[in-house]
Regions:
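N-terminal amphipathic/basic-hydrophobic helices that include classical n-h-c signal peptides
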Residues: 1-26
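Short acidic, Gly/Ser-rich segments with clustered Asp/Glu that frequently serve as metal-coordination loops
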Residues: 39-47
């Protein structure tokens, strides 16, 4: 089993920016990329992500969940052990979350060889608006960012989940990642990229957007009875049209463009902070 350092500090004040980390290679060439996802080691989106990554770097590492981990957000496993199974050269499945995958890859399985970039995806379905709070795809990228690795979450929108246009992400993904790397982004930021549900030739330009409200209207619980007479419950999202803010991610995606939104772990609401500051002491 490949092993490495057991500890790596979170990114903080004085850490190099993502652009500086990436540009350390002459000619902006990446040496190694770490891949993960939330749909699991056998997901078609992970195969697409591998296609994208192999056009960007010679050394690709895959550390992905053994089973589907959709909706686990930034969770990491603190109360049960993580099992690792080797599935090929630099390819591992673990009994954990996308966040666990990022930690296991960067801090252990890669043997101390830091990745130049972490890519998480390609998710089956868009990750937009407030649903990014639940997204394991975004959570995996956010964890990579907190470990000091430039990180991008990638998702492919669909109308019919059984007719996902994976070729769109596969065809356009390498160019999108190269364009973003050439620009660079902040040290405490990860990027959330969504591809529209269109053939590659019909897709618009890469567009910067803000995180909108999205389509999430609420949650619901669906209940049934199994063959043994025991009840079971499924938690599901309830979606529908909602008014979006200016420059929203969902409006840009529905217009047929590839959307990128920079996301941070700092969730402080500045407007509410200033309101509360009028009555409460500050640290």
């Amino acid at each position: 089993m490949i092993g490495g350092p057991s500890r790596l500090d979170f990114v903080g004040i004085g850490a190099k920016s993502a652009r500086e980390l990436i540009m350390k290679r002459s000619g902006n060439v990446l040496e190694r990329i770490l891949l993960t996802n939330d749909d699991g080691i056998g997901a078609p989106g992970l195969a697409v992500l591998e296609q994208i990554a192999r056009e960007l770097a010679p050394e690709i590492w895959v550390v992905a969940p053994e089973h589907d981990q959709s909706g686990v957000s930034h969770a990491v496993s603190l109360h049960h052990p993580i099992r690792v199974s080797e599935r090929g050269l630099r390819r591992f499945a673990i009994t954990g979350t996308p966040g666990d995958c990022a930690v296991m890859g960067v801090c252990h399985l890669m043997g101390g060889m830091r990745p130049d970039l972490l890519l998480c995806g390609v998710n089956r379905g868009a990750n937009l608006g407030m649903e990014t709070v639940f997204s394991g795809t975004v959570g995996g990228a956010m964890t990579g960012m907190m470990l000091g690795v430039p990180s991008i979450a990638l998702s492919q929108a669909w109308t019919d989940r059984y007719q996902v246009q994976w070729q769109t992400a596969a065809t356009l993904g390498p160019g999108v990642v190269r364009q973003l790397l050439a620009i660079g982004w902040g040290e405490a930021t990860c990027l959330n990229v969504n591809f529209p549900d269109l053939p590659a030739e019909g897709v618009g330009a890469l567009t910067l957007a803000r995180q909108g409200v999205g389509l999430l209207q609420g949650m619901q619980v669906e209940t049934g009875t199994d063959p043994r007479g025991l009840s079971y419950h499924w938690i599901a999202f309830r979606r529908g049209p909602r008014e979006q803010g200016p420059e929203s991610d969902i409006d840009a995606l529905q217009a047929g463009r590839i959307v990128v939104t920079p996301l941070r772990y700092d969730r402080t609401d500045e407007e509410a902070y200033q309101l509360l500051a009028k009555s409460l002491p500050r640290e």
